[in-house]
Amino acid sequence: MHDITSSKKMENGIVVFWDENGEKKNESFNYIELVDMKINALDLLERPKYYKVDVAAHKLIVQK
């Protein structure tokens, strides 16, 4: 599980970024996936550091 450092709006979803071993990594989530995980897309864009990403499970976790 990795702490998200930033996020960016895409045409059909949001891409999140994190640092792993000094390298910037990313994973994208479409809006349907975000709704299914009960993630507020606007909150993810405005407060990305409140979230963690589990790349293996392709999930976002709120860490407020």
Spans of features found by a protein language model:
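Mixed-charge, Lys/Arg-enriched low-complexity segments
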Residues: 36-64
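N-terminal acidic leader/helix
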Residues: 2-34, 38
